[in-house]
Regions:
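Well-ordered alpha-helical scaffold segments within catalytic/enzyme domains
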Residues: 1, 72-87, 137-145
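Low-complexity, Ser/Thr/Pro/Gly-enriched N-terminal "stalk/linker" regions
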Residues: 1-66, 96, 100-117
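Soluble or luminal CAZymes and related metallo-dependent hydrolases
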Residues: 9, 93, 130, 134-137
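Alpha-helical packing segments of well-folded alpha/beta enzyme cores
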Residues: 13, 17, 70-73, 77, ...
Length: 145
């Protein structure tokens, strides 16, 4: 069955990605290995600095720079998947992604701000910059959910 083979490949990619790039503490996917995300102390100092030595307001290269964008995209995809499969596993994955997006939007206490990501170490440190792609995908994923 072609669908079964495709599902198996998708599940392998999910599990492999989750093992390296996902933190169950924050329910977010990172763009670096979770173990390589800067410490809360480095985040507070806006490190790593940009290549030109300037302050890194958005956390570029930190692994936290696109968590909300990725989370929204993943959540929307999980909602599509749930519409077809109606399975408990997809429902649980979607709920986890929703929790991560809500964390990024609330952990800092700044109403209306969506952080790009949250430290997987202390589950609260963030970089102060965001962008429209973080908002767009995060809100779209939450809307689909």
């Amino acid at each position: 069955n072609d669908n079964a083979a495709l599902e198996a490949k998708i599940e392998k990619i999910w599990q492999d990605s989750k093992a390296v790039f996902y933190s169950p503490k924050t329910d977010l996917f990172y763009t670096r290995k979770v173990v390589d995300v800067p410490s809360p102390e480095d985040i507070a100092q806006l490190k790593p600095l940009k290549k030109n030595g300037k302050i890194n307001w958005h956390g570029g290269g930190s692994g936290t720079e696109d968590c909300s964008m990725l989370g929204g995209i993943i959540l929307a995809g999980l909602c599509d998947r749930y519409e077809v499969l109606k399975d408990d596993e997809t429902k649980a994955r979607a709920a986890a992604m929703c929790r991560g997006l809500i964390l990024a939007a609330t952990v800092h206490g700044d109403r209306g701000f969506i952080a790009r990501g949250v430290s997987p170490e202390d589950c609260k440190s963030i970089y102060p910059g965001s962008s429209r792609d973080q908002y767009t995908h995060s809100i779209h994923g939450l809307w689909r959910y």
